[in-house]
Every structure is written in C-alpha cells, then in structure tokens.
Amino acid sequence: MKSISVLALALAVSTSTASAQPVRWTKYTIAQTGTSMDFPSSIFTEEAGRPDVYGQRFRTADGRADITIQAAPNVENDSPAAFLAKKHPPSRIQYKRVTPRFFAVSSYKDDKVWYNRCNFSGRLIHCVLIDYPAEEEHAWDNIVTRMSLSLSGR
C-alpha cells in the first residue's frame, strides 16, 4: 500500500506542463501578416527560433512541447486540400478535417502528439503547429482547441 501512495505522489508531483498551473493567455500577433491566436504564454515561455516564413517558434521551459505560429504566402493559390496533399502527410493520421477555408490534422510520432491547423485567407496561409507529449494528451486537449479555434488572419 505504501508503494501505491509513493507512486501516486510521484505522479502528482510530475503533473504535466499543460495542467500544473492555471494557464495565462495572451494574444500573439504576427504584425506583418495579421495572423493572430490565443497563446498560452505561461506554458510556452522560451523562444525557439523562427520558421522560414513569418512567425515564431516557442517551447516549454523543460523542452517537452513546442509550438510554431506562422504565416506564409499561398504562392500557388492552393485550396486547403491541395496544399495538404502536396505536403504528403503520413497515411496514419488520427484526425483530419479539411474544409474550403482550413485544414487540421493530428497524429502521433514516437512519444509525441503533433497537431497542425492552417487557415487560408486571400494570399496567405496562417498556421499553428504544436508538438507535445502523448502521455499528456488529455491535459492538452482544451489548450490545443482554444489555440486552434482562435487562429485567424487577414
């Protein structure tokens, strides 16, 4: 019984980054493109470089999760379906939704969940790309949903 209590305590102490503290939200905006999104600034505290296009990468302080918020020109005026097809996503995608205005895809790679959503507006593609530990998937559900649904651009 004592070992069960120790295990429960260890699990409680190692709570996920996503649920350990109340989440502080801010609005992140890419000034050059108008891309914006609700951003959990209390989770993604470290800048982690820039993508090849407009935007920024961030990671958690412990490096277990990362996010890229970016915007890129839609040079070939692709629809979400055409753009996604050109990226050759893996065949074993767990979640896929494609509409005339956006796509969202998610699956597992090694011990991580990856989630990508891209909204199409005019000549720009506005995206959020998130990777986080698969063992914390349920703790991240509401956070990922809020970020995804708040993604917008002009």
Model feature map: region roles:
Residues 14-16, 25, 34, 67:
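Intrinsically disordered/low-complexity terminal segments and short unstructured peptides
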Residues 140-153:
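Short, low-complexity, Pro/Ser/Thr/Gly-rich segments in the mature regions of secreted, periplasmic
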Residues 1-4:
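Positively charged n-region of N-terminal signal peptides that target proteins for export
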Residues 6-19:
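Hydrophobic h-region of N-terminal signal peptides that target proteins for export
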Residues 22, 45-142:
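Conserved polar/disulfide-associated segments of primarily extracytoplasmic proteins
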Residues 21-52, 151:
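N-terminal "mature-domain start" segment
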Residues 14-16, 39, 147:
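Generic detector of short, well-ordered, non-transmembrane alpha-helical segments enriched
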